[in-house]
Amino acid sequence: MELTHPMKIYKICDARLWKDAKKAGTFHGAGIDIEDGYIHFSTAAQLPDTARLHYHNREGQLLITVDATPLDITWEPSRGGDMFPHLYSALDLKHCMHVEALFLGENKVPTPINGWPK
């Protein structure tokens, strides 16, 4: 049975980094991405835990929706063996479908105003 992966993947990103990426037309990732050699993304189902574990109490975050279809995404195990999307190159911003500001919601976790994507 062939595994199917979602067409949309997501990145939580500091607004200042995103501003720089918009000027350049490409996103190379945050510090952890550059350190690891790939851009960390999440699926819609993984987003709430990603926000809670890695972005707790961090204001000024954005949720970037990315069309994964044309990208060379590598799916690799991470938290609990769950498969996460990774991009081993810079992200051309033409693949970004939507950018949304997050607010510090319940328990100081950055959250979209209308809830997480399904």
Annotate each language-model stretch with its function.
Residues E2-K118:
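Conserved, structured core segments of small domains
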